[in-house]
Structures are given as C-alpha cells and as structure tokens.
C-alpha cells in the first residue's frame, strides 16, 4: 500500500516494516527493543483507562501492543498500512487463540467510514508519518467525545540523537540501521501545539528509559529520549 495523503505513513516506511514482518514476533530479533518496551507502554495505557471497551491501535504492526490490550480485556481493532505485518499479526493471534480484529487500513479510511472509539493508541508511529499535525487531526476524528489518545514516540533532542538514533542503531545495534530519522522526532511541546487545533489536550506524559545492561525499560520523569503521552478530546 502506498498511501501518500497528508498524515499517512510514508511509502518507504511501509516498505521498511513489510520487510520486518516475518521477524516481528522474535523476542531476540530486530524488534527485541519493542518486545522489552511493550509491558511499559501497554501498562501505562492500562493504568489510565479504568473502563474496558473498544480500542483502536493505529500502526499496530504485527500486533505486539494489540495482543497485550486484548489480554487486558479491551475489544481491539488493529490497523496498519503495511500488509505483511497485518498478516503476521492475524496469524499470531489465531495461534494464541485471541479474539481481536486486524485490517490493512489507514486512519483516513476509518475516518471516511465514520468509525469512533473511546481509546486510540498510536505507539511508535507518529515519527513515521508525513505530517504529524494532520495525523493527530485524523486521530482526533477517530475518538469519541472525551476519548483518550495515547502516543509513544521519541523526543528530538541531542540526547535522543546520541542514544535513540546513533547509539540504538549503529553502536548497540538494538534496532536495524535506518529504523528512524531523527529529524522526524517530535518534542512534547510540539506534540501539544500540533494537537490543540484538533481539539486535543495533552494531559499526561511519562518518560521511558532503557537499561542496556539489564535490557529492560522503566518509567521515569526523563522525557529526553523515549516518552509516552496521553491526550484527551474535549
């Protein structure tokens, strides 16, 4: 799929993640950092959503977060513009006996269908889209009034360049080289400014720090590299 509408994933990003689909569920493979990060990401969402209901996971990839949300009791729909990860996600969920739905689709497609959800997540996605402000506007149109949007991404700081880009991809080799473009990282202040015209308000943030020796993630007050954000639709 090569959708180039504003806010959509870039075609080269879609191709990149299609290539990774077969190895997505390997905890020792190229997606190992996401496997390690997943409990922190999904647990933070869980702690902010007391009610169990419908949840849309935008840019779900092969379903790491979507499956975790389904196990928590959410009624999950995962969408991704890349077909191969969706195929891997569907097969993995079937093997695990989990009841959740996946579609090869963009946020634009669901907006056109008039779909709305009380909870929308876009984890490690916004740094891969053409226009973050337009992407946030699309996500706001997928939320029910008062709904919550959860973003997980990387801050654009010198530390994130050193740690999240150069260190992770070229020194520690935690991620395949070229996974991220540092110039596409977004600061929390930029996220807040981009979200406000869409009626979204930033209500909570949490930093995520990686322990290289333990190969584990922990929550922290440090937002300088990886961080989580919760936004609410007025």
Provide a role label for each language-model segment.
Residues 1-25:
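N-terminal, positively charged/glycine-rich alpha-helical extensions of SAM-dependent methyltransferases
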Residues 25, 168-177:
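Short glycine/proline- and charge-enriched loop/turn segments
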Residues 26-45:
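Conserved SAM-binding loop and adjacent beta-strand
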Residues 42-49, 53-158, 188, 229-231:
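Conserved SAM-binding loop
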Residues 150-172:
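Conserved class I S-adenosyl-L-methionine
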Residues 173-190:
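Acceptor-substrate binding/catalytic loop of class I
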Residues 201-211:
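Conserved S-adenosyl-L-methionine
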Residues 216-234:
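Core SAM-dependent methyltransferase catalytic element
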